[in-house]
Amino acid sequence: MLETNTENRKKNYIVIYDFLSEKKSDEYKSSFNKLYPKGVTHGKWAEDAVGEFATCSQTWLGNNSTFFCSHYLANSKEDVEKQVQSWGTDKYASFFVVEVERFTSSLKPKDEIINLDNWYENNK
């Protein structure tokens, strides 16, 4: 059952993917044309990026790159790993997940305070 309440997904994770081969890279990239033959809006992509275990909020992928990365919101590293596997992305690329305690962006509201509570372990 798809969890629609994503408010509890508070932690930020970056996933770095490395395509298993050039063929797998091409297959992955062309799969979106099959999934969205008439194109897709950012809104529809965002709606589809809410998974059972984690939510993918951003992805960066170059046409000629052998790797790509995504930004996820989730409760745990394990939840992100389960989400990547449930979408089948691991059939195209190896991946590793890194929790990032600090997420700053020019896309966030300009007056939003950046949470530095866990930034670089304040006790260092």
Question: Predicted segment positions?
Answer:
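Short S/T/G/P-rich N-terminal loop/turn motif that feeds into the first structured element of a domain
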Residues: 1-57, 61-66, 75-79, 102-124
